Design a protein with these regions (language model features):
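Glycine-rich, histidine-containing beta strand-loop boundary motifs that form or position
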Residues: 110-111, 141, 167
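Alpha-helix N-cap/loop-to-helix initiation residues
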Residues: 115, 145-146, 171
Length: 172
């Protein structure tokens, strides 16, 4: 029998429990970033905040905004990932980057857990759209350093579907 939900426990949680879980995870994430990222420690300090000041979604507006320019400058100051990285660099398992069409590119560094969470979220989205293990997908996105191609491929595989990696490439 085919399961209706990809992640039944998370996708059928009561609204009150979901709100509490979101608040707990948000507070935990903000604390983690504050405790482990030099750039965000400085940004929070400038905003007269700590990693414990935002505990609910309604308070997200209080967080200091980060621009792409700041990320680029951070990566120039402290290559390759910048001082906004909140994980030890030896825990980085995958590296993507932006295209650089609006300036220099920005690296995105993922730990194994980051990649797993990304693939779980993507697979849940594909599952909600009706994708199932008996389906076959011709995947035509570009397999380069930007996140879309490979990430979508892995998300599709996580649903159990068969994936044909067709993607665009060098035609010479």
């Amino acid at each position: 029998m085919e399961k209706e939900l990809f992640h039944p426990k998370m996708e059928s949680i009561a609204a009150k429990d979901q709100q509490r879980l979101e608040q707990d995870l948000l507070a935990e994430q903000i604390r983690y970033v504050y405790d482990h990222s030099e750039m965000y420690q400085e940004k929070f300090k400038t905003a007269k905040m700590t990693g414990r000041d935002v505990k609910v979604v309604q308070n997200l507006y209080r967080l200091p905004f980060t621009t792409k320019r700041e990320l680029r400058e951070s990566q120039k100051r402290k290559p390759p990932f910048g001082d906004f990285l909140a994980a030890p660099s030896d825990k980085v398992r995958r590296i993507h980057r932006t295209s650089g069409t609006t300036g220099s590119f920005v690296y995105t560094a993922l730990t194994a857990n980051d990649a797993d969470v990304t693939h779980d979220c993507g697979a849940r989205s594909f599952w909600a759209a009706g994708l199932r293990p008996h389906h076959r997908v011709v995947h035509c996105l570009n397999y380069c350093m930007w996140m879309g191609g490979y990430t979508d491929h892995a998300n599709l595989e996580k649903t159990g579907a068969s994936v044909l990696p067709f993607g665009v490439g060098n035609s010479r």
